[in-house]
Regions:
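Conserved ABC transporter NBD signature motif
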Residues: 27-41
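Conserved ABC ATPase signature
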Residues: 96-100
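Catalytic Walker B motif of ABC-type/P-loop ATPase nucleotide-binding domains
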Residues: 121-125
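H-loop/switch region of ABC-family ATPase nucleotide-binding domains
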Residues: 156-157
């Protein structure tokens, strides 16, 4: 599980959006050796944005049908049932999403990314709007997905949230990668120490 770690404005979301082709960029981006602009690559990754992109008038079930059919997924309904139960949204699935709280909308965004059975999951600040119990459930879900072979890239500025689950971290500052750390290589230092040693503390307010 790979983390893009950096203060607000470091370029984490820009990086995620570039990978998903939501922003124009210079150079080449490849996923498993395949250009990210190719249809195969696009079908292979799921994207969970920081701010959920949903249709206010559609219900959860209608969103599921729209995404499942757009991606031509075979078992999307069964997966949707699984994640709706996991996120405790059973009694909300017939409601228009405009009636849902911010945290619930974030959960809907997650389940829509997961019902396509992505090989790669790109997650931008996933804990925004979630209560502590939901954060723990989400972390456990990411660990389970990793064990199932899903490659996960998470951007965050909150170190403590990802401390227990990360394997590899790229620390960003001012649009650049300033450090790359593997958990297995850490000895006496913590990821938090490396983070603060790598970024310019005078210009950013850091959340730990």
């Amino acid at each position: 599980m790979t983390i893009l770690l950096g203060p607000n404005g470091a370029g984490k979301s820009t990086t995620i959006k570039s990978i998903t082709n939501l922003l124009q960029y210079k150079g080449d981006i490849k996923i498993n050796g395949v250009a990210n602009s190719s249809l195969d690559a696009k079908k292979g990754f799921g994207y969970i944005p920081e701010a959920p992109v949903l249709y206010d008038l559609l219900t959860i079930d209608e969103h599921v049908e729209f995404i499942g059919k757009a991606y031509r997924c075979e078992n999307y309904r069964a997966l949707a049932d699984e994640y709706i139960a996991l996120f405790k949204l059973e009694d909300k699935r017939k409601k228009a999403v405009r009636e849902l709280s911010k945290g619930m909308k974030q959960k809907v965004s997650m389940l829509l990314a997961l019902i396509i059975s992505p090989k790669t999951l790109l997650v931008d600040e996933p804990m925004v709007g979630l209560d502590p119990a939901s954060i723990e459930e989400t972390l456990q879900l990411f660990v389970r997905l990793k064990q199932q072979g899903v490659a996960i890239l998470i951007s965050t500025h909150i170190i403590d949230v990802i401390e227990a689950i990360w394997d590899s971290a790229y620390i960003m500052d001012h649009g650049r990668i300033v450090a790359h750390v593997r958990k297995e290589e850490l000895k006496d230092k913590s990821i938090k120490e490396i983070f603060f040693a790598s970024v310019e503390g005078d210009e950013h307010e850091h959340t730990v």
